[in-house]
């Protein structure tokens, strides 16, 4: 997004993560703006959005990317743990979306990108709250489009597949069962790379997507296209 000309503003509840992000971007020669923010706090969101639009620029593009996951079987999960995930992963985008959309409505344009997941479509053991939130985010994306498309605001989602990141590095090794599973389960035959998401994000943030609304683009190497195949099948 920065390479395409966007001014980057990053929010996080953890100041140390913001400092790390600022350094990472600075090492690439990119200046970013950072603000400490809890996306589940509606009053704080309203104050921070107003501050950003005063200190930086009106927000033309919003990427809802905050998220947490708790890997707990349903029978062992407490209701409060379930609510915590929904609060960040679903209520957070709702609060951020409606707060930023007010200005977009006044200006008559805007782009909102909600980071969904393959779990918007599929279930998996121990991630019931995350899957419920991401499934809800898919439908929230469609409802935002239903209400705001008339104001020339495009609201779409991106559903990443399994990506090669620092977090997945420990299991992305030859011989690891999950690594072998992902490679065989993905028609593209590999893990996604961070740069694989860039084109989709830039497209959804640009005028090229002005008539695309309420869609979730799955960047997953084809996982959702197939039931998969037995391990002994070529």
Residue ranges and their predicted role:
Residues 102, 146-150, 210:
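Alpha-helical segment proximal to the catalytic Tyr-Lys
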Residues 117:
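Residue(s) in the substrate-gating loop at a strand-loop-helix junction
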Residues 122, 202, 213-234:
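Short C-terminal tail/terminal secondary-structure segment
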Residues 97, 133, 141:
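Active-site helix of classical SDR
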Residues 73-74, 81-86, 182:
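Substrate-binding pocket helix/loop in short-chain dehydrogenase/reductase
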Residues 72-75, 122-128, 150-151, 189, ...:
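Active-site loop immediately N-terminal to the catalytic Tyr-X3-Lys motif
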Residues 63, 149, 154, 212-214:
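Short, small/polar-rich loop/turn modules that mediate ligand/substrate recognition or access, typified
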């Amino acid at each position: 997004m920065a390479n395409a000309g966007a001014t980057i503003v990053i929010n996080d509840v953890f100041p140390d993560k913001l400092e790390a992000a600022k350094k990472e971007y600075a090492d690439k020669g990119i200046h970013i703006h950072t603000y400490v923010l809890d996306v589940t706090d509606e009053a704080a969101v309203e104050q921070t959005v107003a501050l950003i639009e005063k200190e930086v620029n009106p927000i033309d593009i919003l990427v809802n990317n905050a998220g947490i996951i708790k890997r707990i079987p349903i029978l062992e999960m407490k209701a409060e743990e379930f609510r915590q995930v929904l609060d960040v992963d679903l209520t957070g985008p709702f609060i951020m979306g409606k707060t930023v959309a007010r200005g977009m409505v006044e200006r008559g344009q805007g782009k909102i990108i909600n980071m969904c997941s393959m779990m918007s479509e599929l279930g998996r053991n121990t991630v019931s709250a995350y899957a419920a939130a991401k499934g809800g985010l898919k439908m929230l994306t469609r409802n935002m489009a239903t209400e705001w498309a008339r104001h020339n605001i495009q609201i779409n989602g991106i559903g990443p597949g399994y990506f090669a990141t620092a977090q997945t590095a420990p299991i992305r090794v030859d011989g690891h069962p999950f690594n072998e599973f992902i490679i065989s389960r993905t028609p593209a035959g590999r893990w996604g790379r961070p740069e694989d998401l860039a084109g989709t994000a830039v497209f959804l943030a640009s005028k090229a997507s002005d008539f695309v609304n309420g869609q979730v683009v799955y960047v997953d190497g084809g996982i959702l296209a197939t039931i998969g195949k037995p391990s002994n099948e070529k």
